[in-house]
Amino acid sequence: DKDHPIRNWTEHQREVFSVDWNNIQKELFMSCSWDGNVKIVRVYTDQWHPERPASIQTLPPHGACVYKAAWSPHDPTVLATACGDGNMRLFDTRIPAARPVATMGVGGEVLSLDWNKYRRMTLASGSSDRTVKTWDIRAQPAPAQSVLTGHTYAVRCVTWSAHQSNILATAGYDMTARIWNVDD
């Protein structure tokens, strides 16, 4: 039925900004919100009931809007968040209380992030300071691998190519979409 979703969650206290499916543990889904929370839901379960909370895990509050949360395409327990406090955080859901295993200070509100599909330890971020940064998360604290400039307003979206490990697409509030070769 096109007018009725098969599942509906109402656990967030503010607008939900982003959702993402876990590509490895296919029953896991997460949402993030302006309320600063990230909620992980096991979608396909017989215990689901519309009057009970559906989330199986809530990450510690970020203290600011979480604009984007994305599962790693390489590890089913690892995810990254892009936050309005200027930080990108990495979480391993196996760690008790799900504290961040790493925090990267990006600068400006972090509006977007994306995992590289081929380079398992590489992330890209886009932020309100008009920069795009790539990160090698093996080094902690992780310095930015590259800083791409050129957008004249905030960078709202970053997406790695599904076909080439070095190609990154970005979109900004400057009304432009750009393609970058991060190896140049």
Give the ranges of each region predicted by the language model:
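Loop-centered beta-sheet repeat module
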Residues: 59-91
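WD40/WD-repeat beta-propeller blade N-cap
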Residues: 9-16, 59-66, 104-110, 148-155
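Structured C-terminal portions of repeat-based eukaryotic scaffold domains
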Residues: 100-184
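Loop/turn segments within WD40 beta-propeller blades
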Residues: 19-26, 70-76, 114-120, 159-165
